[in-house]
Amino acid sequence: KIAAYFPDGATEEYRLRIAQAAGGTMRPVVSGMAWVDLLPQDCDKGTALAVLQRHLHINREETMAFGDNENDVELLRQAGLSYAMKTGNPCVLRLADRAADDVISELNMLLSELE
């Protein structure tokens, strides 16, 4: 991946300009307030999670993921249980199964339910 930093914010205009410059060979996604990631068309966090699931012989239902921005969309889709950070991008909040204040608190709550 290539990460581009825009001090004045990662606007849709910047994302579209990067997409045009990439000529369809790569895909720009917003990854933070001031960041745009440029990814290969066939590779993202969801692809990486799928490889890890196969390697560990676990299925989607045995996987959970946390995300907060556009670069996490495929990751959340690949996980059996997906969490968006409450302060995250609205598109991620709509996609996720649940919303969380922070990862550690959510994991502690889930672990306490198992005891």
Whereabouts are the PLM-identified features?
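Conserved acidic, metal-coordinating active-site core of Asp-based
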Residues: K1-F66, E70, L75
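Asp-based, Mg2+/Mn2+-dependent phosphohydrolase catalytic module
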Residues: Q78, S82-E115
